[in-house]
Amino acid sequence: TPTPEKGIGAIVALMFMMLFLGPIEEFGWRGVAQPLLQRHFAPLWAGAIIGTVWGIWHLPAFFLSGTVFAAWNFFPFLVGNITLAILVTPIFNSARGSLLWPMLFHWQLINPFWPDAQPWDTWILIIVTGLVVWLNRRTMFARQGSATAVCSGEAKEEA
């Protein structure tokens, strides 16, 4: 992403704004939905469900002119959201339900210093997600040990 004409101050302001806009979604995705879904589904499937809803949540942006979404295809975006939600699932569970790491993960996705998305990014995400799921297969396919407390101060794990 090139530096805006107004200088570095504009990019710092944008980063500060993005620190709240995207990551605030994590209160809903990981703070509420993930723990509730993990009470009934293995973390892998909870993440896949969240990723699907997360992608659909952004669907209206694809119809707004002037947004980056307007130039993208929805299907690769949806697949990317599903893989990202699955990727953040072991982060969330390893952090015992803390929202800090998922929020930082979300923020780095929309960080204006990263290069623009490329068509092959989805394939890279699929490969990385497959590897992460395989490396965490004991915890990704079983509800035991997953965080199930909803936005509480102390996270609880499914016994």
Task: Name each region found by the language model.
Residues 1-15, 66-80:
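Juxtamembrane helix-entry segments on the extracytoplasmic side of multipass membrane proteins
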Residues 18-23, 51, 55, 77-82:
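Residue-level hotspots within the lipid-embedded alpha helices of multi-pass solute transporters
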Residues 20, 33, 84-88:
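Hydrophobic/aromatic residues in alpha-helical transmembrane segments
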Residues 23, 92, 130-140:
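Structural signal for the C-terminal ends of transmembrane alpha-helices
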Residues 24-51, 93-98:
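Membrane-interface helix/loop boundary segments of multi-pass membrane proteins
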Residues 51-61, 106-115:
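Aromatic-anchored segments of alpha-helical transmembrane domains
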Residues 72-131:
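Functionally important transmembrane alpha-helices
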Residues 134-152:
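Membrane-interface capping segments at transmembrane-helix boundaries
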